[in-house]
Amino acid sequence: MKKITPKSFEEALSRLESLTQSMQGEMPLEDALAAYQEGNELVRYCQTKLAQVEQKLQVLDADGPKELNLESDE
């Protein structure tokens, strides 16, 4: 099976939704297995992307939350 490399998280999520829809209908067994395998690869890709974003957010928030001042000093 070839390695799945979506261009973005959103593309992977869209493909997962499409696979889910197609698997809910009538599908030959071999096609269903291939769709399941592709779905697993896409889920792993999405989980990795989410973990990377979470890690970046933790780095950005390392100094703790900042107070937001919405009042202008005019």
From Swiss-Prot:
Catalytic activity, reaction form: Exonucleolytic cleavage in either 5'- to 3'- or 3'- to 5'-direction to yield nucleoside 5'-phosphates
UniProt-listed SUPFAM superfamilies: XseB-like
Keyword S-adenosyl-L-methionine listed: no
Top enzyme category: hydrolase
The keyword Cytoplasm belongs to this UniProt entry's keyword annotation: yes
GO molecular-function terms, A-Z: exodeoxyribonuclease VII activity
Pfam families hit by this protein: Exonuc_VII_S
One BP term from GO: DNA catabolic process
Subunit structure: Heterooligomer composed of large and small subunits.
UniProt family annotation: Belongs to the XseB family.
Function recorded in the entry: Bidirectionally degrades single-stranded DNA into large acid-insoluble oligonucleotides, which are then degraded further into small acid-soluble oligonucleotides.
Identification of the protein by name: Exodeoxyribonuclease 7 small subunit
Lineage: Bacteria, Pseudomonadati, Pseudomonadota, Betaproteobacteria, Neisseriales
Gene: xseB
